[in-house]
Amino acid sequence: MFRPILKRALAYCPQRLVGVAVDDTRLRKTGRSIPQAFYQRDPLSPPFHLNLMLGLRFLQASLLVPLHHTTSVGTRALPIRFQEVSRIKRPGKKATEEMKKQYREAVKQRNLSRSFVEMAKQLRQELDQAGGSDKILVLAGDGSFCNRTCFGEIPERSVLLVRARKDAKLCFRASTDSRRFYGVDKFTPEQVRKDDGRNWKTT
């Protein structure tokens, strides 16, 4: 359904980097018999009060077409993916241990992060088929995708750019002569931002 959009819009992305914005969105529902519908945070809630809404959750991706390079308009976002990623329904109180075990395994395989990883692989494959095998796919998302699952399975010739908490604990890989996997020195994005020893460029 979305492949023709990607194929035709790729001609307007002459640079080596091809940007794709990824985010999850919600669709309100009122029927209680919809299996995939569940109560979730209402994004329109005021900051001082959390509201819940019954609805479906979708994962969407939009190709960022840099028209500002050739025309007087800004970047345009064209939809290239829209798929449902509602969560697995929790078993009831009378569920057996086997049902609870199956639920825990299903949650690990069918969640927002796993859906993002599979979608990223599909987008990389479709970009190659559209003639963009020499381009770098840049996936941009919010903090929902700043986790080990998403960073651990980035497709080849792809980059993941996400927003991180300013107090997140980060570290580099340990040196090759160490038995550790992660380095001992830790830092946060806020410390990097305030580091006077780093030169920042405004683009």
Positions of PLM-derived features:
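Active-site-proximal, Lys/Arg-enriched surface segment
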Residues: 1-90, 195, 199-203
